[in-house]
Amino acid sequence: MPAPTALKQPPPAPEQQAAPAITNENEDELLIDIQQAAATLTDPNAAEPPEETMENEMAVDEEGRPRFAPGKNIDPIRRIETRKIPIPPHRMSALKANWTKYPPLVDHCKLQVRMNIKEKRVELRSSKYTVSNEALQMGADFVSAFAMGFDIDDAIALLRLDSLYIQSFDIKDVRQTLGPDALSRAIGRIAGKDGKTKFAIENATKTRIVLAGSKVHILGAFENIGMARESIVSLVLGAQPGKVYNNLRIIASRMKERW
């Protein structure tokens, strides 16, 4: 055992492992890679991207404007829509009797139609054969016109003519102080004896009028509806039928001159 005051000897260093010698083959590969990298950096054409093929190039005309392929006609995606038109109870029997006269809804508008007797309504639905976007609304107007009381032939005119409209108003809105007796008298003044006054207004203004209780429905062109409404309002307010007839004759003569 050495003395405590003796000098300590440093521990022996571990034997260093000899590094593996690089073979000649690895040296050759390193030299080749270095030479290729240097050639790539010095070559100006090496960094350019590959040229596009003729297929990817955009075709242009003589003025330099691009030419595109003609567009294809693609049918738009149509959403199936439905309409449910309620039918008053007093019009259900007329609807059943005239149901065979409803082919224009299928032939002209290309709609699917069915009568829901339990719910008392007519249901319309567009299909893949429906061409016009307005066909469903035209069919709904047709059924609504029949439900209001118009004749089936007059309602079919809504499908064939785009210039026809329906306007409704209440007699009580014209004269709000009408009592039960005054309301019946106003309706009688509009209709006339055996319906002569109503027919005279229809023939002079080329419209169709339906009296349903206190409601008045007018079918016709926009200007014609305005003239018929003025005549009806005059009768409700108490104008003499003779004066209204004279105004209708003037209106009829003006319409003949215009057309």
Swiss-Prot record:
One GO cellular component term of this record is: cytoplasm
An MF annotation (GO) of this entry: RNA binding
GO biological process assignments: ribosome biogenesis
| Ranges of compositional bias, category Acidic residues | 49-61
Top-level taxonomic group: Eukaryota
- Residue span, KH domain: 180-232
Could you tell me the keywords of this UniProt record? Answer: Cytoplasm, Nucleus, Ribosome biogenesis, RNA-binding
Region span, Disordered: 1-25, 37-74
Pfam families for the chain: KH_PNO1_2nd (PF22891)
Q: Where are stretches of biased composition, namely Pro residues? A: 1-14
What does the subunit comment say? Answer: Component of the small ribosomal subunit, ribosomal RNA processing complex (SSU RRP complex).
Q: Which family does it belong to?
A: Belongs to the PNO1 family.
What is the annotated role of this protein in its UniProt record? Required for small ribosomal subunit (SSU) synthesis. Has a role in the processing of early nucleolar and late cytoplasmic pre-RNA species.
**PANTHER family, alphabetically?**
RIBONUCLEASE Y, RNA-BINDING PROTEIN PNO1
Full protein name: Pre-rRNA-processing protein PNO1
User: What lineage does UniProt assign to this protein's organism?
Assistant: Eukaryota, Fungi, Dikarya, Ascomycota, Pezizomycotina
